[in-house]
UniProtKB/Swiss-Prot annotation:
Official protein name in the record: 4-hydroxy-3-methylbut-2-en-1-yl diphosphate synthase (flavodoxin)
Pathway of action: Isoprenoid biosynthesis; isopentenyl diphosphate biosynthesis via DXP pathway; isopentenyl diphosphate from 1-deoxy-D-xylulose 5-phosphate: step 5/6
Domain of life of the source: Bacteria
Statement: the UniProt record of this protein carries the keyword 4Fe-4S: yes
Catalytic activity: (2E)-4-hydroxy-3-methylbut-2-enyl diphosphate + oxidized [flavodoxin] + H2O + 2 H(+) = 2-C-methyl-D-erythritol 2,4-cyclic diphosphate + reduced [flavodoxin]
Family listed: Belongs to the IspG family.
């Protein structure tokens, strides 16, 4: 039953992506990106709905050409979550999705082209109240910066970002956020640190092309964890070569670990050893699968023996300590004993009961103001 995060977040300007605030005092928003063919409207809508069910706040959709832009408009009509259009090279695509109701434009001004084209995109965004994300990536730095620095560096990423920020400043446009992504953790972290000191706009965090589910999760947790612990970051996207739903889960797990957001169950579980009185790994796998639908923030401890079990269980909303018999704690107090027979079924029932009670109590507290 952990309290508020001790992290003091960097002060930033608040913008709105659809109905989701980003920056300022807003919760750190969790994003993901579809990996379907955007022209396959049904498949893309279905994937977006799965992301919504997982708790995503904002979804980015790649729009590589005009056909995809028209498909984007149809997708937008069928979903409620804010959509970001990912635009490269052709500024006319950005103009079209702006007409079709996009909630945010992700552009790399370095590959959009001449200043008049960037101005056209900015004017369209301003007229419709659409924010822009300046997306700088180590893999697509401007040629002059590549020549100047010889290779991608934190300073090169920041110089590119500030170049585009100054461009928007000249156009008197402030409704934007910025990312400076790299696949190298240290490069990305240092770039964000440098940029955070120089602008007030919200920062979109990510380790780009981080890798597969396991390696990408580790890289993202390390890199984003370092930044978030320093108060840097207003929205996050975990880039994984995996099901996009996993990006949302990992994003929330990172935020939960830092007490920056709470959604669903925060499991505390031992790695298990020969002292365990029940199969901890099997129990955890079953519980995680069964309880994915719960959205109420809840700490659940699953500890296999009495060495650390009672201490961890007393700190959780629901805790299980292995023993003969096993002992359940509710809100830090011993509640009932359980044998290994139907252990997961009984534990699931108790967790759901506690979640319902907490949801009711939280609702009453909100109603009282």
């Amino acid at each position: 039953m952990h309290g508020e995060s001790p992290i003091k977040r960097r002060e930033s300007r608040k913008i709105w992506v659809g109905n989701v605030p980003v920056g300022g005092d807003a919760p750190i928003a969790v994003q993901s990106m579809t990996n379907t063919d955007t022209n396959d409207v049904a498949a893309t809508v279905a994937q977006i709905q799965r992301l919504v069910d997982a708790g995503v706040d904002i979804v980015r959709v790649s729009v590589p050409d005009m056909d995809a832009a028209e498909a984007f408009g149809k997708i937008k009509q069928r979903v409620s979550v804010p959509l970001v259009a990912d635009i490269h090279f052709d500024y006319k695509i950005a103009l079209r999705v702006a007409e079709l109701g996009v909630d945010c434009l992700r552009i790399n001004p370095g590959n959009i082209g001449r200043e008049d084209r960037v101005r056209a995109v900015v004017d369209a965004a301003r007229d419709r109240g659409i924010p822009i994300r300046i997306g700088v990536n180590a893999g697509s730095l401007e040629k002059d910066l590549q020549k100047k620095y010889g290779e991608p560096t934190p300073a090169a990423l920041v110089e590119s970002a500030l170049r585009h920020v100054e461009h928007l400043d000249r156009l008197d446009f402030q409704d934007f956020k910025v990312s400076v992504k790299a696949s190298d953790v240290f490069m990305a972290v240092e770039a964000y640190r440098l940029l955070a000191k120089q602008i007030v706009q919200p920062l979109h965090l990510g380790i780009t092309e981080a890798g597969g589910l396991r390696s990408g999760t580790v890289k993202s947790a390390v890199g984003l964890g370092m930044l978030l612990a320093e108060g840097i970051g207003d929205t996050i996207r975990i880039s994984l070569a995996a099901d996009p739903v996993e990006e949302v889960k990992v994003g929330y797990d990172i935020l939960k670990s830092l007490h920056l957001r709470s959604r669903g169950i925060n499991f505390i579980a031992c790695p298990s050893c020969s002292r365990q009185n029940f199969d901890v790994v099997k129990t955890m796998n079953e519980l995680e699968g069964r309880l994915e639908d719960l959205l109420v923030p809840l700490d659940v401890a699953v500890i296999g023996c009495v060495v650390n079990g009672p201490g961890e269980a007393k700190e959780a909303h629901v805790g299980l300590t292995g023993g003969t018999p096993n002992l359940i704690y509710i809100d830090g107090k011993p509640a009932q004993k359980l044998t290994n027979d139907n252990l997961v079924d009984e534990l699931e029932k108790l967790i759901r009961q506690k979640a319902a009670e907490k949801a009711e109590a939280d609702a009453a507290l909100i109603a009282r103001g």
